C-alpha cells in the first residue's frame, strides 16, 4: 500500500467506516439488482456489527488522513472469520486490500488461529478472485438456501456447477 498505514480502529472512525459499509452494501445491491439490500440506512449495520463483536480486532487503512479501508477479525478458538473487509472503490487495485489481509493474517497467526475464513457474497466475483489469489483455496462450508417467496424471485442467475450439481446465485 503506497503512502498509507494500517492501524487499529478508533471511535472517531465511525462515520468513515459506516460509509465504507454503505458502499459495500450498494455494491451488493448493484450485483444482485435489488435496491432493498441493507434497508434504508445500511451504514447502521456497521453499528450492529460493532455492538455484536466489538472493535478490539478491527483495523482501518488510512491514506492522507482519510479512512479508505476496513477489516475485522472474529475469533472463535482456533477458527476465525474475516468480517468485514472493504476498500473504498476509488482506492481499489492499489494494494490496500492486500495490506488489510496481511494484517488480519498476522493477527490470526499471533492468536494461534488455524483456519481463517471469508464469506464474500456469491456474485462478488472480483472479491472471490481476490481472495483466491491471496490463498483462500479451500472450501470449508457452503451456504445454501431456498427462495420461499411465491413466486420465487427472478433475481437468481444460473451459477456454478459444484460436485455435479448446478446452482443459481
What feature does the model see in each segment?
Residues 1-15, 158-169:
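Conserved N-terminal entry element of GNAT/NAT acetyltransferase domains
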Residues 4, 11, 22-48:
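Conserved GNAT-fold acetyl-CoA-binding loop/helix
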Residues 21, 131, 136:
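Conserved active-site tyrosine of GNAT-family acetyltransferases
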Residues 47-60, 81:
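A short helix-loop-beta-strand connector motif used in the catalytic cores of GNAT acetyltransferases and
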Residues 60, 66-74, 81-86:
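Conserved beta-strand in the GNAT
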Residues 87, 93-106, 129, 133:
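Conserved acetyl-CoA-binding loop-helix of GNAT-fold acetyltransferases
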Residues 108-119:
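Conserved GNAT acetyl-CoA-binding A-motif
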Residues 118-128, 144-150:
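Conserved beta-strand-loop-alpha-helix junction that forms the acyl-donor binding cleft
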Amino acid at each position: 500500500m503506497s503512502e498509507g498505514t494500517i492501524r487499529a480502529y478508533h471511535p472517531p472512525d465511525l462515520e468513515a467506516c459506516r460509509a465504507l459499509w454503505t458502499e459495500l452494501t450498494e455494491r451488493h445491491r448493484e450485483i444482485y439488482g435489488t435496491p432493498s439490500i441493507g434497508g434504508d440506512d445500511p451504514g447502521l449495520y456497521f453499528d450492529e456489527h460493532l455492538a455484536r463483536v466489538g472493535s478490539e480486532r478491527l483495523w482501518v487503512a488510512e491514506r492522507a488522513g482519510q479512512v479508505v479501508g476496513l477489516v475485522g477479525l472474529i475469533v472463535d478458538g482456533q477458527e476465525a472469520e474475516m468480517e468485514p473487509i472493504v476498500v473504498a472503490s476509488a482506492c481499489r487495485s492499489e494494494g490496500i486490500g492486500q495490506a488489510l489481509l496481511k494484517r488480519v493474517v498476522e493477527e490470526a497467526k499471533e492468536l494461534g488461529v488455524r483456519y481463517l475464513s471469508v464469506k464474500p457474497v456469491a456474485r462478488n466475483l472480483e472479491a472471490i478472485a481476490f481472495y483466491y489469489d491471496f490463498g483462500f483455496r479451500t472450501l470449508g462450508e457452503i451456504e445454501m438456501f431456498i427462495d420461499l417467496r411465491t413466486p420465487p424471485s427472478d433475481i437468481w442467475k444460473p451459477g456454478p456447477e459444484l460436485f455435479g450439481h448446478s446452482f443459481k446465485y
